[in-house]
Amino acid sequence: QDVEAGAVSFRKCAPCHAVGEGAANKVGPVLNGLPGRKSGTIAGFNYSDANKNSGITWDKATFKTYITDPRAKIPGTKMVFAGIKNDKEQDDLWAYLSQFGPDGKKK
């Protein structure tokens, strides 16, 4: 995985999501601490019932399925994004996001 390529890919996500120290919820929730986090648990973000009740714990495989087609993975999600179909881009994006701990600091 290429973290720098993942950072470039994250530009597609940045209009709605934030990562890093001082990140705040936007249209979408903060993505700090994503690996191992339960879906629908970021404080202060108004998740859809579908997201809160999905039972998802984020790992690479789940993320890749979700980011391929968010509305297919979680019908009823508020996320309005067509998805990322390219396998390498998905891997790079996961590598980029995975480096941020829950506090937004890089591991």
UniProtKB/Swiss-Prot annotation:
SUPFAM superfamilies: Cytochrome c (SSF46626). It holds the Pfam family Cytochrom_C. It is found in: Periplasm. Binds 1 heme c group covalently per subunit. Its main location: periplasm. The modification Pyrrolidone carboxylic acid is found at Q1. Keywords: Electron transport, Heme, Iron, Metal-binding, Periplasm, Photosynthesis, Pyrrolidone carboxylic acid, Transport. GO terms for molecular function: electron transfer activity; heme binding; metal ion binding. Heme c binds at C13, C16, H17, M79. It comes from the Bacteria. GO terms for cellular component: periplasmic space. Cytochrome c2 is found mainly in purple, non-sulfur, photosynthetic bacteria where it functions as the electron donor to the oxidized bacteriochlorophyll in the photophosphorylation pathway. However, it may also have a role in the respiratory chain and is found in some non-photosynthetic bacteria. Belongs to the cytochrome c family. This is Cytochrome c2. It comes from Rhodoplanes tepidamans (Rhodoplanes cryptolactis). The lineage of its organism: Bacteria, Pseudomonadati, Pseudomonadota, Alphaproteobacteria, Hyphomicrobiales.
